Swiss-Prot record:
Domain of life: Bacteria
GO cellular component terms, A-Z: cytoplasm
Keyword line: Cell cycle, Cell division, Cytoplasm, DNA damage, DNA repair, Septation, SOS response
Domain LysM: residue ranges: 38-89
Name of the protein this chain belongs to: Cell division suppressor protein YneA
Family: Belongs to the YneA family.
Entry annotated with the keyword Cell cycle: yes
Localisation per UniProt entry: Cytoplasm
Entry's Gene Ontology BP terms: division septum assembly; DNA repair; negative regulation of cell division; SOS response
Induction comment: Repressed by LexA.
Cross-referenced PROSITE patterns: LYSM
Coiled-coil stretches noted in the UniProt entry, renumbered to this chain: none
Family matches, as InterPro entries: Cell_div_suppressor_YneA (IPR022887), LysM_dom (IPR018392), LysM_dom_sf (IPR036779)
Length: 105
């Protein structure tokens, strides 16, 4: 069966539009997912390990799992962070002043 030129154009446009919608939905849902977590600003002298030490000691979380989660969710290519960088960490926001530890794995 040979498709007409109009049919080919329709299928092509439909595919492009559907792909765009799927990409937008996946981007929006991942952004909303991260909105439930605490965001911190990196200070002078901070490292991923020093931040992990602060959180892991008080929340009984494995430091390696913490660093892996932070690197993944913040799309870090290296462990280098700079003052002023904003990082999402695995502490879920409960409300303005209270937080609970998120599941890291």
């Amino acid at each position: 069966m040979i498709m007409s030129k109009e049919s080919i154009i329709f299928v092509g446009l439909f595919t492009v539009i559907l792909s765009a919608v799927i990409l937008m939905l996946s981007y929006t849902s991942s952004g909303q997912e991260l909105n439930q977590y605490v965001k911190i600003e990196v200070q002078q002298g901070d490292t991923l390990w020093s931040i992990a030490d602060q959180v892991a000691d008080t929340k009984k979380i494995n430091k390696n799992d913490f660093i892996e989660w932070v690197a993944d969710k913040n799309q870090l290519q290296t462990s280098d962070i700079q003052p002023g960088d904003e990082l999402v960490i695995p502490l879920k926001k409960k409300h303005q002043d209270a937080y609970e530890l998120a599941t890291v794995r």
